[in-house]
């Protein structure tokens, strides 16, 4: 393990912070400030796993020191051999734990614990691209439900032949962004479309964007930059459909962003939803601009969030999903049904390896 003294110093600092937060939670005056209490609870929870791992590491190191003393003092060859075997086992456990702690000490993305807006846009391929966008939407809904997250349709633009020209899902739950952020990019499908009469394989694409939730204070929006029109909602619904103007179309003039919302029951709710989506999109643009400035000299292979980055190909003929960032293949029929945890964990592991390599370069 590199720089053990530095690691211990960092862990001691984290432990002190954790203990301070624990003490603050016991302050009765905190009950009158629920927002501050929630902030402290979240901060403490974010440190808990690291503190527990550090405590375990200290106990194992103490055991190892005791066994080393036993090996030095023991006169009986058989007992010394048993102690040496125990020492070897402890060394292996400590090494594994140090690897785990190293990962825990890697800088965290400040957005990792946030909920997200997941946007899917049909790309090249016409009707088939829109149908594929619908397939991806179902894949993410099933994955989210399997994770225990909640999913709500925020905005949609259905296509005539099925699927969507564009669809936005609001996904809420524990550490949603930390997993879904690796899904951002271009997804490509190779298959025979339902509209194809001669059995030829077509290639189509859809683009996925993962945008973390933002508070109003995070993004300033000038009301004069917004143009809002209302229309009657279309599609299935109750008596209000096509009679009351509940649908909202919002245009943000400086960025050219268009948002159409009709999923909520009232015009006021749809306007609030459109503003929420606009804030998320503007924040995403700001974050990507900052990321490009910081990483202009060195492009990460995993998790750049670049909209133009081709990340996967879904080949139906061979029942194969290829992740181009990882150069790995996965089974398509299970992945498209929402079983993508293995794909996501592989991307997370690759990103962590990159972080470790970068850390080694910077400290070398």
From Swiss-Prot:
Entry similarity comment: Belongs to the prokaryotic/mitochondrial release factor family.
Species in which this protein is naturally found: Gloeobacter violaceus (strain ATCC 29082 / PCC 7421)
This protein's encoding gene: prfA
Signal peptide from the UniProt entry: none
Post-translational modification: Methylated by PrmC. Methylation increases the termination efficiency of RF1.
PROSITE patterns: RF_PROK_I (PS00745)
Protein name (database record): Peptide chain release factor 1
Subcellular location: Cytoplasm
Domain of life: Bacteria
Listed InterPro entries: PCRF, Pep_chain_release_fac_I, Pep_chain_release_fac_I_sf, Prokaryotic/Mito_RF, RF-1
Alphabetical list of NCBIfam families matching this protein: prfA, PRK00591.1
Modified residues (N5-methylglutamine): 239
Keyword annotations of the record: Cytoplasm, Methylation, Protein biosynthesis
Described function: Peptide chain release factor 1 directs the termination of translation in response to the peptide chain termination codons UAG and UAA.
Matches recorded under Pfam families: PCRF (PF03462), RF-1 (PF00472)
GO MF annotation, one: translation release factor activity, codon specific
Any one GO CC term of the record: cytoplasm
């Amino acid at each position: 393990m590199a720089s053990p003294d530095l690691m211990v110093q960092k862990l001691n600092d984290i432990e002190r912070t954790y203990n301070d937060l624990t003490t603050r939670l016991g302050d009765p005056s905190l009950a009158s400030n629920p927002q501050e209490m929630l902030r402290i609870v979240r901060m403490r929870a974010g440190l808990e796993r690291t503190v527990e791992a550090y405590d375990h590491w200290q106990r194992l190191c103490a055991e190892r020191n005791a066994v080393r003393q036993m090996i030095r003092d023991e006169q009986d060859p058989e007992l010394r051999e048993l102690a040496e075997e125990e020492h070897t086992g402890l060394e292996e456990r400590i090494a594994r734990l140090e690897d785990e702690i190293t990962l825990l000490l890697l800088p965290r993305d400040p957005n990792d614990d946030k909920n997200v807006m997941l946007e899917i846009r049909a790309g090249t391929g016409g009707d088939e691209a829109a149908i594929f966008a619908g397939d991806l939407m179902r894949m993410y809904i099933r994955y989210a439900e399997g994770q225990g997250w909640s999913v709500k349709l925020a905005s949609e633009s259905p296509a005539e032949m099925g699927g969507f020209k564009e669809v936005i899902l609001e996904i809420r739950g524990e550490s949603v962004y930390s997993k879904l952020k690796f899904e951002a990019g271009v997804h490509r499908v190779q298959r025979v479309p339902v509209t194809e009469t001669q059995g030829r394989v077509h290639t189509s694409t859809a683009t996925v964007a993962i945008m973390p939730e933002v508070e109003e204070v995070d993004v300033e929006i000038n009301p004069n930059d917004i143009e809002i029109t209302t229309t009657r909602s279309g599609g299935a619904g109750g008596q209000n459909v096509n009679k009351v103007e509940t649908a909202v179309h919002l245009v943000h003039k400086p960025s050219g962003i268009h948002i159409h919302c009709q999923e909520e029951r009232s015009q006021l709710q749809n306007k609030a939803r459109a503003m929420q989506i606009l804030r998320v999109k503007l924040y995403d643009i700001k974050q990507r601009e900052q990321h490009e400035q910081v990483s202009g000299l060195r492009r990460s292979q995993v998790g750049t969030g670049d909209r133009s980055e081709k990340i996967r190909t879904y080949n139906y003929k061979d029942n194969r999903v290829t992740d181009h960032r990882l150069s790995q293949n996965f089974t398509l029929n299970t992945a498209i049904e929402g079983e993508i945890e293995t794909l996501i964990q592989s991307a997370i592991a690759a990103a962590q390896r990159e972080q470790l390599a970068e850390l080694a370069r910077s400290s070398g």
